[in-house]
């Protein structure tokens, strides 16, 4: 039953009464937050939750997500003993390999599972048949089994979480539509509903497939696309004497199964995916009355899945069909959750569960509640942080292209160094065309085209003898070794124009940066400092270099993918610490950035400038304005590869001229254009760490 009288004030308002919203509310109450209101536009579970398939698998490629899913299982066991059980069934799960490559992946996953204490074991075909007697083993190479995986009824789970939240003091209002979210000084101030206004400090957007619409109320782009996801339920046919079946996944055939009463649920991830939208001009807008509804059946898109299912479980071609479900699920561009505080202070999101929100719901609720209470993540959630998305994802069309590709690759084997092919070419270096004409093999990061390495026409027959076998060697190239050795022995020239560049200025800029940075960064004009940025517990939020370019102006250089994360953290600290005389701006696209490193770097650079580059005149971690071909640019003596060299920051319009001048000057000194794969190899060889990887 919904609480009747809407309060005029609450500390926290949760929008969305699906499994995500109720889990967040449950955990807020569990951690002592009593002043919480949850709102839903219709009934609880009326978005995507009610039609979710209910599978709960724990092991994922991401360690953080694995830990979150493991917590979910612990929570569901606990809820099953409560006054309102969650209908949790610990039936186990099987994954089978229908190819040798998949079997190799399964064996890798068994190794990963051991690091978490998970009971994932390899099983033979006979054991698979014993556990799942309905299976046809044709083409099956082997499989694995995890006894502690299971399934849960999504509506019962949501009900159990909502009941627990209410017992903890949370007030829940259904059939209450949010009309506006109001801000003051870029912070949450109140929520306006069709039943009145609630003054509040924090809003948590748990709107699921509606999350993008809710985000637009505060002009925040949330890159979630509702995708049609289909599955069927058979009539009852499993004899009573058959033990309850574990769930079964056959990713090579794109299908999954679980038992439903005495029948089967069967679904999958088709190669011809389709978004759900209110109109042809919008990719993330849901009809206003789409509550507790499904989409029309699209059997033609499901046909391949059904055929694969009948081959793997032949009875699927014989039994009757009880129900066919086509329900929209919110997907993100990388199939990871979308969590955390946005660019608006106090406006959080917990959505985009990519059809595995039931498995993750317990963990999602826990980490988001902790994040809200602490004001920062309590564990490494970078891969789920909404700030991981670049500004390119403000385009629904760009987002859709990437969502479709990742949806259709959901069950694929993923290899180190693989690249996405969709939504390419959004951001390019000013010398992109030169790279392309000279054999560059491009990768993409945060919607930037970047050179991975070069394959020159004269080097097609590279030495492949060192290529690793199997999974690791899929995207390996001998060209990286050539670039690596050129940098160590002569000089490498790198285009790092995608690096994020943030200008911090104002009367209190130095004071502000010294507050949030672990190192003193106010060392005088033209001094550069490498520093970590710490949270209240001393954890590393980010790391970057800061160059003082004037008395009250600083240039921050950080990773390509970290612009919104790092700029967002700066803005949050400025807001919370009342530094109103500080200005923060993104100047990434104003400057090209080239790195020239190696034993011959000084000789090459000195040939094109009159400025003294000697060690005495231009020491390490110093920065100066110099000229190359009458072009003024900033040169910073720094290295990310462990060799002598400089990073050069050049007005974009002059980028090609400087690049060509350096190549020409270094022709007789062994200079070689190099890509990001060489940077990775070089930095790791020297023990240089990267945030979000080794840090």
Q: What kind of feature is each model-predicted range?
A:
Residues 54-131, 252-257, 261-265, 275, ...:
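Dinucleotide-binding Rossmann-like beta1-alpha1 core, especially the glycine-rich loop
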Residues 23, 57, 181-283, 287-296, ...:
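Flavin-dependent oxidoreductases
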């Amino acid at each position: 039953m919904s609480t009747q009288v809407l309060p005029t004030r609450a500390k926290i308002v949760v929008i969305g009464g699906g499994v995500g919203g109720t889990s967040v509310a449950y955990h807020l109450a569990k951690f002592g937050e009593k002043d919480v209101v949850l709102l839903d536009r219709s009934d609880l579970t009326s978005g995507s939750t009610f039609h979710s398939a209910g599978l709960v698998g724990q092991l994922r490629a991401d360690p953080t997500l694995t830990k979150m899913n493991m917590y979910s299982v612990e929570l569901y066991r606990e809820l099953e003993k409560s006054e309102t059980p969650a209908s949790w069934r610990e039936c186990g799960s099987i994954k089978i390999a229908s190819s040798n490559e998949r079997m190799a992946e399964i064996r890798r996953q068994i190794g990963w599972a051991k690091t978490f204490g998970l009971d994932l074991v390899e099983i033979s075909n006979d054991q698979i048949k014993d556990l799942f007697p309905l299976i046809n083993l044709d083409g099956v190479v082997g499989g694995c089994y995890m006894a502690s995986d299971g399934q849960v009824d999504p509506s019962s789970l949501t009900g159990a979480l909502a009941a627990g939240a209410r017992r903890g003091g949370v007030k829940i209002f259904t059939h209450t539509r949010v009309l506006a979210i109001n801000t003051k000084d870029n912070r949450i101030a109140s929520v306006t509903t069709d039943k009145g206004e609630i003054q509040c400090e924090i809003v948590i957007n748990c709107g699921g497939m509606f999350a993008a619409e809710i985000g637009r109320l505060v002009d925040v782009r949330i890159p979630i696309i509702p995708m049609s996801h289909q599955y069927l339920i058979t009539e009852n046919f499993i004899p009573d004497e058959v033990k309850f079946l574990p769930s079964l996944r056959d990713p090579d055939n794109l299908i999954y199964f679980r038992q439903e009463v005495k029948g089967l649920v069967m679904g999958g991830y088709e190669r011809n995916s389709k978004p759900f939208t209110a109109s042809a001009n919008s990719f993330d807008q849901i009809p206003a009355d789409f509550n507790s509804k499904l989409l029309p059946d699209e059997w033609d898109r499901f046909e391949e899945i059904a055929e694969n299912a009948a081959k793997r479980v032949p009875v699927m071609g014989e039994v009757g069909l009880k129900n066919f479900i086509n329900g929209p699920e919110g997907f993100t561009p990388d199939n990871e959750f979308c969590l955390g505080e946005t660019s608006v202070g106090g406006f959080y999101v917990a959505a985009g569960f990519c059809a595995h929100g039931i498995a993750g719901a317990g963990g999602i609720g826990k980490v988001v509640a902790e994040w809200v209470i602490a004001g920062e993540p309590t564990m490494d959630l970078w891969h789920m942080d909404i700030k991981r998305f670049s500004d390119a994802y403000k385009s629904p069309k760009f987002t859709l292209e990437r969502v479709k590709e990742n949806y259709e690759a959901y069950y694929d084997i993923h290899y180190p160094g693989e690249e996405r092919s969709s939504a390419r070419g959004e951001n390019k270096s000013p010398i992109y065309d030169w790279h392309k004409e000279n054999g560059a093999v491009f990768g993409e990061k945060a919607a930037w085209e970047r050179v991975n390495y070069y394959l020159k026409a004269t080097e097609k027959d590279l030495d492949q003898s060192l290529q690793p076998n199997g999974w690791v060697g899929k995207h390996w190239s001998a060209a990286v070794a050539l670039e690596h050795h050129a940098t160590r022995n002569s000089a490498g020239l790198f285009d790092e124009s995608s690096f994020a560049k943030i200008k911090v200025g104002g009367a209190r800029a130095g004071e502000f940066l010294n507050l949030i940075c672990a190192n003193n960064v106010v060392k005088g004009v033209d001094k550069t400092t490498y520093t970590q940025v710490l949270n209240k517990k001393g954890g590393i939020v980010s790391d970057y270099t800061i160059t003082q370019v004037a008395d009250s102006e600083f240039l921050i250089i950080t990773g390509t993918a970290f612009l919104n994360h790092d700029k967002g953290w700066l803005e949050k600290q400025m807001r919370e610490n009342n530094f109103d005389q500080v200005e923060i701006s993104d100047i990434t696209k104003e400057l090209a950035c080239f790195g020239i490193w190696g034993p011959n770097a000084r000789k090459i650079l000195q040939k094109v400038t009159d400025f003294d580059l000697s060690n005495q005149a231009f020491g390490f971690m110093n920065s100066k304005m110099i000229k190359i071909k009458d072009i003024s640019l900033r040169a910073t003596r720094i290295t990310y590869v462990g060799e002598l060299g400089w990073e050069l920051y050049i007005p974009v319009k002059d980028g090609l001229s400087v690049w060509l001048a350096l190549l020409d000057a270094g022709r007789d000194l062994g200079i070689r254009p190099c890509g990001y794969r060489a940077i990775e190899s070089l930095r790791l060889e020297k023990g240089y760490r990267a945030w979000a990887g080794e840090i």
